From Swiss-Prot:
This is Thymidylate synthase. One of its GO terms (molecular function) is thymidylate synthase activity. It comes from Lactobacillus acidophilus (strain ATCC 700396 / NCK56 / N2 / NCFM). Pathway: Pyrimidine metabolism; dTTP biosynthesis. Homodimer.
């Protein structure tokens, strides 16, 4: 057993001490560090944080959503996952059809104005309910555009046909494991202007040696307190699922970040997290009857012995 989150704790502490204070797209402000790397040996356990509770169910449903090639939040809402709500809601309130209360800068205003936050939460709840109840509304306003699911599984070529990058990379791993081209990318410059949020985890590459498979992720932008813990667990889970399908043992997850940042309104939460003593990392259980990534459902993926400290809440910068 091991404490696999230590590289994350070391990096977030380094950013607090050595990072540069910068402005950002959301208007919140960040403390930022450029060019960082963390390594996690997945043969020793599963690298989910224990210094705060990380909701593994949300990570599972989001990854399954990506792997389905889905880009509509309806699937997520059906699994009580609200990670992407704000991005779809932003499209709705900026549309000509929206006639409700003014939602300009709802992300920042909801943090500083309690009365507005009540109005915002009520509108967001109505929006989610309508996505679930109204299929046509969901098709129009629940779709986030060319986000991860589309790029991973339906990359559009110039001739109008599509590339399934996940299927292709699995075939490469099986048939040519020494290839240096086992890459999946989500960054398409043509789609950046129309995407709800241009991909943060831009590309990942697989590497096979001695019967073990590793993956390295390049992430252009990482919200260290809220987003990155999800990304670590998500790619660790993805690697385990790919290892299952290809008959390999898991090796390392290597996480390389461009702009690794802590939002200024997360500083106190980070300090609280760093004051806690981490527990040993849990183990991942995958249903042994499932051999292919498309076969996995929520109940086929579990954590064993996940002991953790309490939740630390923090606002999302949109």
């Amino acid at each position: 057993m091991a404490i696999l989150e230590q590289p994350y704790l070391d990096l977030i502490n380094k950013i607090m001490i050595e990072g540069h204070d910068k402005n950002d797209r959301t208007g919140t402000g960040t403390r930022s560090y450029f060019g960082a790397q963390m390594r996690f040996d997945l043969s020793k356990g599963f690298p989910i944080l224990t210094t705060k509770k990380v909701p593994f169910g949300l990570i599972k449903s989001e990854l399954l959503w990506f792997l389905r090639g889905d880009t509509n939040i309806r699937f997520l809402l059906e699994h009580k996952n609200h990670i992407w709500d704000e991005w779809a809601f932003k499209n709705w309130v900026n549309s000509d059809e929206y006639t409700g209360p003014d939602m300009t800068d709802f992300g920042l205003r909801s943090q500083s104005d309690p009365e507005f936050n009540k109005i915002y939460q009520a509108e967001l709840k109505k929006f989610d309910r309508r996505i679930l109840d109204d299929e046509n509304f969901a098709k129009k306003y629940g779709n986030l555009g060319d986000v991860y699911g589309a790029q991973w599984r339906h990359w559009q070529k110039r001739d109008g046909s599509f590339i399934d990058q996940i299927e292709n990379v699995i075939e490469q791993i099986k048939n040519n494991p020494d290839s240096r081209r086992m890459i999946v990318t989500a960054w398409n410059p043509e789609d950046v202007p129309t995407s709800a949020l241009p991909p943060c985890h831009v590309m990942f590459q697989f590497y096979v040696v001695d019967g073990k498979i590793s993956v390295q992720l390049y992430q252009r932008s990482g919200d260290m307190f809220l987003g990155v813990p999800f990304n670590i667990a998500s790619y660790a889970l993805l690697l385990n699922m790919i290892a299952r399908e290809t008959g390999l043992q898991v090796g390392e997850f290597i996480h390389t970040l461009g702009d690794a940042h802590i939002y200024s309104n997360h500083f106190s939460q980070v300090k609280e997290m760093l004051s806690r003593k981490p527990y040993e990392s849990p183990q991942l259980w995958l249903n042994p009857e499932k051999k292919h990534i498309e076969d996995f459902d929520m109940q086929d993926i579990k954590l064993v012995d996940y002991k953790h400290h309490g939740t630390i809440k923090a606002p999302v910068a949109v």
